[in-house]
From Swiss-Prot:
Compartment annotation: Endoplasmic reticulum membrane
Bilayer-crossing regions: 17-37, 56-76, 99-119, 139-159, 164-184
InterPro entries reported for this sequence: DER1, Rhomboid-like_sf
Chain ranges on the Cytoplasmic side, renumbered to this chain: 1-16, 77-98, 160-163
Segments in the Lumenal topological domain: 38-55, 120-138, 185-190
Family, as annotated: Belongs to the derlin family.
The name this protein goes by in its record: Uncharacterized derlin-like protein C1687.17c
Superkingdom as given in the UniProt entry: Eukaryota
Organism ancestry: Eukaryota, Fungi, Dikarya, Ascomycota, Taphrinomycotina
Keyword DNA repair (UniProt): no
GO cellular component assignments: endoplasmic reticulum; endoplasmic reticulum membrane
GO biological process: endoplasmic reticulum unfolded protein response; ERAD pathway
A Pfam family reported for this protein in Swiss-Prot or TrEMBL: DER1
Length: 190
């Protein structure tokens, strides 16, 4: 039981709430408390029926409980915590702004493409931003080889393409969102 208090005290606030929200949303769907049909993002339901929670839950549901959820949560804890801690002061507000901009950008993207659940695209965008803010890190890919951080998103795109056989257009759009955000916030004089 000492794990939960330690997690709460050591995880930055925005990352903590996203991780807990993802865990609770995924468990609620998997245990049948909520149907995934009630939480996926759909513009018609969002605008016409006023189901505004869908704009948040689309980023908090990963899929069936299993290895993908565990890997996703470990990613969030590791990379998003580092990104939140390295955000400019005040850290929590700066990182929350980043998360909200990425969420909004992905929601706009979902208007033009089918993206009922955006958690994986959100994590990919955050991975892209993290990789460029921490370019000297090396990440082990499947324990087979090491890659410098800026190349990790591209290796992930290639692995998804090889695994599914489907061109990962939405991953590339997520990378573009991350690139624009990184360029505007780190290189722009505006």
């Amino acid at each position: 039981m000492a794990i939960l208090p330690e997690f709460i005290s050591q995880t930055p606030p925005v990352t903590r709430y996203i991780v807990l929200g993802t865990l609770f949303t995924t468990l609620a769907v998997n245990f049948g408390y909520v149907s995934d049909l009630k939480i996926f993002f759909n513009w018609k339901l969002f605008l016409a029926k006023g189901e505004y929670w869908r704009a948040i839950t689309t980023f908090l549901y990963v899929g069936p409980f299993g290895l993908e959820l565990i890997l996703y949560l470990s990613f969030l804890l590791r990379f998003m915590s580092m990104l939140e801690r390295s955000s400019p002061p005040p850290q929590t507000q700066s990182f929350l702004k980043t998360v909200l901009i990425v969420w909004f950008s992905l929601l706009v993207t979902s208007y033009f493409s089918y993206m009922p659940f955006a958690a994986s695209y959100f994590s990919f965008t955050m991975l892209y931003i993290w990789s460029w803010k921490h370019p000297l890190y090396r990440i082990s890919i499947l324990g087979l080889f090491d890659v410098k951080a800026p190349y990790v998103p591209w290796v992930m795109v290639l692995l998804r393409w090889l695994r599914t056989g489907i061109f990962p257009l939405l991953d590339l759009i997520s990378a573009l969102i991350g690139h624009v955000y990184f360029f505007v916030t780190d290189f722009s004089t505006v």
